[in-house]
């Protein structure tokens, strides 16, 4: 497996990437010398990979137990964390146990939060099985679950001891999840690494068919992008906030859909809304908005709020964005990450955020919703989150 050191201030861990490397994954886990291995997966991933991986860990590394949770964003909450923690303790978890998060971003966040709480923190290893997880969520120390009032509002910062990624897991992903992952890649290119835009534009496939070489390049570029902005900001409260590009409207769309809109697809649409906001504020021109829509469409996501999502609900969730409090924003404003051009982030003082009038943001959401009503449904965000073979 190719090893990339990940360093964020005083936090560091190895990211190991390969293809068809399950033996290497098990061998790396064995080196940790755990008293037990607690593999956490949703019910879908458990059927595809969880039982087999747990059996191999049990045979080659040490006692292993598979803990499962229901699939989907609607189950990413404290109740699920509590149930899994009780199951872990029932199976004899102790301070020398290792928790293995096997799955996508939902499982990674649930498991990461559980690992941070058990015995006030036991070792965590991510084994991501989705594009979003491989190139985005496992590279963050943020471990959070949803609350009634919005996404990712309850959580901690907690680092894994390793990330073990095998692109072979991606072969069973439905196109919806592949497209979702590419939404985050487009974000990285637009906000952090504009040098990758030309190659990415050529590589994007609306049918979501990518070979292993392209996927490894996409993941490697995303590792570099994230490292560029988190090296001196492990908690993503300063330069790392750039990673929130597209997330203000994106999270609102995702939450309003009750998980039917995949995370990366929500972020992709959220970026097109952010670009339109930037245009309306006079920071960017129409060509910049067009570039966003072209890239998002090339990734297979309709660049509009989907017709089945109520724009009134989207606008309601905007007020609960998790970036509130970073700026002393005037009443009726919310802080957003905005760009004036690819790689050109707007700042308020040292912070990569701009206070945006909620009324203006809501107008941009309404405009995107009108375009969505005129568009054909896009597979990237239509359908329940557990419709495909992976979450």
Swiss-Prot record:
Name the catalytic site residues.
Answer: 142, 244
Tell me which cofactor or cofactors this protein depends on.
NAD(+); Co(2+)
Which GO biological process entries does UniProt record here? antibiotic biosynthetic process; aromatic amino acid family biosynthetic process
Which UniProt keyword terms apply here? Answer: Antibiotic biosynthesis, Cobalt, Lyase, Metal-binding, NAD
Q: Which residues bind NAD(+)?
A: 42, 73-76, 105-109, 129-130, 140-142, 151-152
Q: Which GO terms describe its molecular function?
A: 3-dehydroquinate synthase activity; metal ion binding
Q: What class of enzyme is it?
A: lyase
Its UniProt pathway annotation is: Metabolic intermediate biosynthesis; 2-deoxystreptamine biosynthesis; 2-deoxystreptamine from D-glucose 6-phosphate: step 1/4; Antibiotic biosynthesis; ribostamycin biosynthesis
Cofactor, free-text remark: Binds 1 Co(2+) ion per subunit.
Q: Which Gene3D superfamilies match?
A: 3.40.50.1970, Dehydroquinate synthase-like - alpha domain (1.20.1090.10)
Question: Which EC numbers characterise this protein's activity in its record?
Answer: 4.2.3.124
Enumerate the catalysed reactions.
D-glucose 6-phosphate = 2-deoxy-L-scyllo-inosose + phosphate
Q: Where is the signal peptide?
A: none
- Report the superkingdom from the record: Bacteria
Positions contributing to Co(2+) binding: 184, 247, 263
| CDD domains reported for this sequence | DOIS (cd08197)
Briefly state the protein's biological role.
Answer: Catalyzes the intramolecular carbocycle formation from D-glucose-6-phosphate to 2-deoxy-scyllo-inosose (DOI).
Q: What family does the entry list?
A: Belongs to the sugar phosphate cyclases superfamily. DOI synthase family.
Can you name this protein?
Answer: 2-deoxy-scyllo-inosose synthase
GN (gene name): rbmA
